Amino acid sequence: QAWKYKDLDYWVDLAKLLERGYFDSLFIADVVGVYDVYRGSVETSLIDADQVPVNDPFFQVPAMATVTKHLGFGVTSALTYEQPYALARKFSTLDHLTKGRVAWNVVTSYLNSAAVNLGLKQQISHDERYDIADEFLDVTYKLWEGSWDEDAVLRDREKGIFTDPSKVHPIGHKGKYFDVPGIHLSEPSPQRTPVIFQAGASTRGRAFAAKHAEGVFISPATPEQAREVSDDIRNRAVEAGRTRDSLKIFTLLTVITAESDEAAQAKYQEYLGYSNGEGMLSFYGGWTGIDFSEYDPDQPLEAIDNDSIRSVLELLATADPHRKWTPRDIIKHRSIGGLGPVLVGGPKTVADELERWVDVGGID
């Protein structure tokens, strides 16, 4: 029923369902551009509804918060095209309205279509986007944590004082990318700083996660690869002055299960029948910057050096080192699961494999 995404009742009912099911949180992905690399057009994305049309996730959260008490809400926001002064207020507002149940999934954006529609001639380079992100978060930390003392708001009716001015401080930030001299617009929220999530497997992305994130999304192909990535991020966290257990690592897995292995495989095959191969290539075009329509469907793809999600092509190669990946292979093996592995089997098969990911891969 995802087509009902534009109706508030859809989100309210979903929140109630997740609360009843004891889910910890609802994570909402988002992009501010379109997938228009494939065939040089947005046409395929529109036909397949590849993250378009899409609404702003910030507006769903307050309604869901009113019908839940425990469910958390992870909201994606691409900071490359935001201003920290304004975005800090948005998250403070959500933190107030949810009573401290909001998280920010920090992304730097990777779609050139977003860049050109938001005033740039082309996408900012990969590493510079992370440089911007580092300073952006430094500014928001100052706004959230340093601008208002905990007891700044008095609400003193007798004296006619709502806020004690001596306890509200300009942050005086002057940096390479941002100048923010003033005070935060919002009084302290329950968390002040929302829980920070981040997803990025490049060397620069891992360093950013190690410095800032409390939750890190990764998408390795195997538990062994997960161990390498999780150990590296935790080691980097220690180098950044944090402890190894100061962040939690989550991996992308798609689980398809039924009463038996055979029934689960049948369900998987049925799901494949609903997948759209061109839609998958449209996604991969946006993720990698490669127009796969220019390649013969059976032509092996060599690693291509481009400036968009560098880890994606490496992931294809490591997912099956004996396969020379072709566009047809992407359609066949990635139409379900996207960038992550797919676990297909009965309850025991799936549970055993999930335990292996935790034990071998170091996943939380």
Predicted regions and their residues:
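Glycine- and acidic
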Residues: 1, 44-46, 72-77, 210-219, ...
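N-terminal beta1-alpha1-beta2 module of alpha/beta enzyme domains
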Residues: 1-67, 191-194
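Hydrophobic, small-residue-rich alpha-helical packing segments that form membrane-like cores
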Residues: 3, 7, 16, 60-195, ...
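Short, acidic/polar
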Residues: 5-17, 198-208, 346-360
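Hydrophobic faces of well-ordered beta-strands that scaffold small-molecule active sites
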Residues: 26-28, 71-77, 100-106, 194-199, ...
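Catalytic cores of nucleotide-enabled group-transfer and carboxylate-activating enzymes in metabolic
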Residues: 34, 53-56, 63-76, 198, ...
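Acidic-and-aromatic substrate-binding clefts and catalytic sites of carbohydrate-active enzymes
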Residues: 51-53, 80-85, 223-228, 343
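An alpha-helical appendage that flanks or caps ligand/catalytic pockets
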Residues: 127-191, 224-231, 235-358
